[in-house]
Amino acid sequence: MSFFRKPQKVITDDAKIRELLTRGVERVYPTAGALEKELLSEKCLTLYFGIDPTGPTLHLGHAVCLLKLRQFQDLGHNVIVLYGGFTAQIGDPTGKGEARPQLSAAAVKKNTSNYRKLIGKILDLKKANVKFLDNKEWSNKLKPADMMAIASRFTVSQVLERDMFKERQKNGQEIYLHEFLYPVFQAYDAVTMDVDMQVGGNDQTFNMLAGRTLMRKMKNKEKFVMALKLLVDPTGKKMGKTEGNMVALSDTPSDVFGKIMSWPDSMILIGFELCTKVPLNDIEALKASLERGENPKHLKLRLAEEITALIHGGSEAKKARSGFDAAFTEGKPQEFMEVRLFGKEIAEALMEKNIIASKTELRRLLCEGAITNLDSNTKMGEEFLKTAPPGKYRIGKHRFIKIHGSDTD
């Protein structure tokens, strides 16, 4: 099945292909050399990145993969953004010690409503070589006999090789049958779209390789897999929605800038590599300057401006930097984000504004003493979860809010 009218003319520039194969790349299957040969052959490849719509926004972790798609798009290759409208209702067990809650079709539809706009911040949606698809379009049509035919291409022992399943068995935890089927149905996406390649984070390697296996068995065709490095904090924890340290693509420019500035210095170089378009040679120069003893804050300011510009444009990034400088050089924040409770809990109100990613993050910030009432200069405790008095607050180092108890105060 082809979703593109005709192959595009592709660019085979050695330097651009070299950067494509190395920047942010953990591993290529079967090999980087085999993929390089394809890229130099002037063949127009079709590749995809899949997103399970488990939340209403996208974050920098998604941006890492979208930036890689943009590199392929700029070379003339066809790229597909695949929504997991079907697989999101199963729930990806990747990295989970327990089963994910299954989403309803209505929840999935609501979550994807803003995705295209956010993805358009990184991909060029005006070009003909980008498509948006949803796996519910074919997976919802599968009959029981079709499902059995697909599932018969895999063995139980293959699926049990997953690290998280081994861990659950070791701990005596349940593994549900629908979780076994997740990589099977995701693999079927690649076969249905007849793609040449899939891009994703290296935590998705098992799922992506399942697609490679199914492609060989059903179509006798090679499917390349590009596993990308993950954006992780110094403890190795992935930056994302579930982890409570998310930089959302829907965040305001000042919030994006402030959140990046709160990153530890150890994330500066990997942040440049994964989340910006700064050339690799320039990143090497930045690394050398750090080794010579340059103040990391100077580089982090540039990183924050680069990432904010990627999401919101250069003009908004400059304004965000000016606001940051005013807040932390002069001690006067230029703006407070307005938060109106209207009877809602503070956690819900803050999540709606993308100030925090989850109630877990808010609880962690309170435990760390990272939320301060600026009117009384007091740190907030657990009681803030239930009763958040109107006033001005600092959350962490770089987020400022003004809480209104009602629409009249």
Annotated model-derived regions:
Residues 2-46:
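Positively charged, low-complexity intrinsically disordered leader regions
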Residues 24, 104-105, 109-112, 116-227, ...:
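Divalent-metal (Mg2+/Mn2+/Ca2+)-assisted nucleotide/phosphate chemistry catalytic cores
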Residues 29-31, 133, 337-342:
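Short acidic-hydrophobic, aromatic-tinged amphipathic segments that line or gate anion-handling sites
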Residues 31-93, 199-205, 211:
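N-terminal catalytic cores of NTP/NDP-binding nucleotidyl/phosphoryl-transfer enzymes
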Residues 90-95, 143-145:
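Short, conserved acidic/polar surface loops in the N-terminal third of protein domains
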Residues 93-109:
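A charged helix-plus-loop insertion that forms the helical arch/lid used to bind
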Residues 96-101, 149-152, 242-243:
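Short, hinge-like loop/turn segments at secondary-structure boundaries
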